[in-house]
Amino acid sequence: MSYEKHSDAKASRYAWNQPWNPFEVTLSDPTYPMNLEEKNQIPYRFQSVPDDVPEVPHIESRYKNLPGNNIYLCCGRLQMSSQYKAFLISLFALILPGVLFFIFSAFWLWHHVSPAVPITFAYLYALAVVSMFKCSTADPGILPRNAYSLTYNPAHPWSVIPEDRKVLVGSTRSDSVFVNTVYCHTCHLYRPPRASHCHLCDNCVEYLDHHCIWLNTCIGRRNYRYYFIFLLSVVLSALYLTGLGFYTSIGSFHESTDTNFAAHLRRPWAGVSFFLGIYGALGAILPGILFCYQCYLISVGQNVHEYLRAKSTETEDVHPFHDSIWLNFLVVLCRPKNVSYVRPTRKSYV
């Protein structure tokens, strides 16, 4: 904002050369002391928009035209596979013990042990539920299709046959190797290293570990950390539930007047707590095995897909993506989460 001077002094076109008094000014042209040429150089965003400016066409998100077996919700922010029956079973198996615990066991533990006990279980249980939904609804790293379509040329019939391409892995290391990139005839692209095509989702996924039917999604680069946290929180919650369930049923028996433990289990809170102890012990077996298996694969620099389909498992060659154990965990679990390839609507991303 500029001002106009009310004195007889010779005015200069530059504000810093004007000997003006702040008490002798009035509001004037906001572009003063600019001349006409300088006014025309004002950025367009500060000028008034004329009525005849054409509208920018709407750019649709890529997920709307992606021919895969995925269901998208909330403008592509939530997505999962179309085979959701096993996911409903796993969701019910996770919700049931939590509801029973807070109805029958949490009250006795709150008043007879400590309020911190049910609060700790609530934190672990909430972490398991949130990580489950985050893992199952996040984009695992689906690669956009038709990135390299092969066109048939009658003069060169072999033009539709993809050529092998190699990518140098670990270029700054002395043990760097070349890794072959496979051409996907379904998605029409050269898959990056460690990417694979999922036949259930019908998409190429970056860093595909495996397709989990119980979470109804592929476990890839963008949701692997949520899958790891889900396994860890489920194991801790199940083991914690086992101890709390047995402690509640046995502790309430010693404080009651019942002489028979079998008769004491007929009481609702005692019987349900004993059931939760057995339920937690059985429920910790499979997630515990998967968690230990994932820790082993991370430590050796592989994933499930690479481990099961390795062609040179009997050789002594070091895996090209293997580094130290701590660095492997750091790369897999703490690497930045890149932008989804199929959801963005910005023009810079499309």
UniProtKB/Swiss-Prot annotation:
<feature type="domain" description="DHHC">
    <location>
        <begin position="182"/>
        <end position="232"/>
    </location>
</feature>
<keyword id="KW-0472">Membrane</keyword>
<feature type="topological domain" description="Lumenal">
    <location>
        <begin position="247"/>
        <end position="270"/>
    </location>
</feature>
<dbReference type="GO" id="GO:0019706">
    <property type="term" value="F:protein-cysteine S-palmitoyltransferase activity"/>
</dbReference>
<comment type="function">
    <text>The erf2-erf4 complex is a palmitoyltransferase with a major role in driving sexual development. Palmitoylates ras1. Palmitoylates isp3. Palmitoylates rho3.</text>
</comment>
<dbReference type="GO" id="GO:0006612">
    <property type="term" value="P:protein targeting to membrane"/>
</dbReference>
<dbReference type="Pfam" id="PF01529">
    <property type="entry name" value="DHHC"/>
</dbReference>
<dbReference type="GO" id="GO:0030435">
    <property type="term" value="P:sporulation resulting in formation of a cellular spore"/>
</dbReference>
<comment type="subunit">
    <text>Interacts with erf4.</text>
</comment>
<protein>
    <recommendedName>
        <fullName>Palmitoyltransferase erf2</fullName>
        <ecNumber>2.3.1.225</ecNumber>
    </recommendedName>
</protein>
<keyword id="KW-0256">Endoplasmic reticulum</keyword>
<dbReference type="GO" id="GO:0005789">
    <property type="term" value="C:endoplasmic reticulum membrane"/>
</dbReference>
<dbReference type="GO" id="GO:0031211">
    <property type="term" value="C:endoplasmic reticulum palmitoyltransferase complex"/>
</dbReference>
<keyword id="KW-0812">Transmembrane</keyword>
<keyword id="KW-0333">Golgi apparatus</keyword>
<feature type="active site" description="S-palmitoyl cysteine intermediate">
    <location>
        <position position="212"/>
    </location>
</feature>
<feature type="transmembrane region" description="Helical">
    <location>
        <begin position="113"/>
        <end position="133"/>
    </location>
</feature>
<dbReference type="InterPro" id="IPR001594">
    <property type="entry name" value="Palmitoyltrfase_DHHC"/>
</dbReference>
<dbReference type="GO" id="GO:0005794">
    <property type="term" value="C:Golgi apparatus"/>
</dbReference>
<dbReference type="InterPro" id="IPR039859">
    <property type="entry name" value="PFA4/ZDH16/20/ERF2-like"/>
</dbReference>
<feature type="topological domain" description="Lumenal">
    <location>
        <begin position="108"/>
        <end position="112"/>
    </location>
</feature>
<feature type="topological domain" description="Cytoplasmic">
    <location>
        <begin position="134"/>
        <end position="225"/>
    </location>
</feature>
<keyword id="KW-0449">Lipoprotein</keyword>
<comment type="similarity">
    <text>Belongs to the DHHC palmitoyltransferase family. ERF2/ZDHHC9 subfamily.</text>
</comment>
<keyword id="KW-0808">Transferase</keyword>
<dbReference type="GO" id="GO:0005783">
    <property type="term" value="C:endoplasmic reticulum"/>
</dbReference>
<feature type="topological domain" description="Cytoplasmic">
    <location>
        <begin position="292"/>
        <end position="350"/>
    </location>
</feature>
<keyword id="KW-0749">Sporulation</keyword>
<feature type="transmembrane region" description="Helical">
    <location>
        <begin position="271"/>
        <end position="291"/>
    </location>
</feature>
<keyword id="KW-1133">Transmembrane helix</keyword>
<feature type="topological domain" description="Cytoplasmic">
    <location>
        <begin position="1"/>
        <end position="86"/>
    </location>
</feature>
<feature type="transmembrane region" description="Helical">
    <location>
        <begin position="226"/>
        <end position="246"/>
    </location>
</feature>
<keyword id="KW-0012">Acyltransferase</keyword>
<dbReference type="GO" id="GO:0032580">
    <property type="term" value="C:Golgi cisterna membrane"/>
</dbReference>
<feature type="transmembrane region" description="Helical">
    <location>
        <begin position="87"/>
        <end position="107"/>
    </location>
</feature>
<keyword id="KW-0564">Palmitate</keyword>
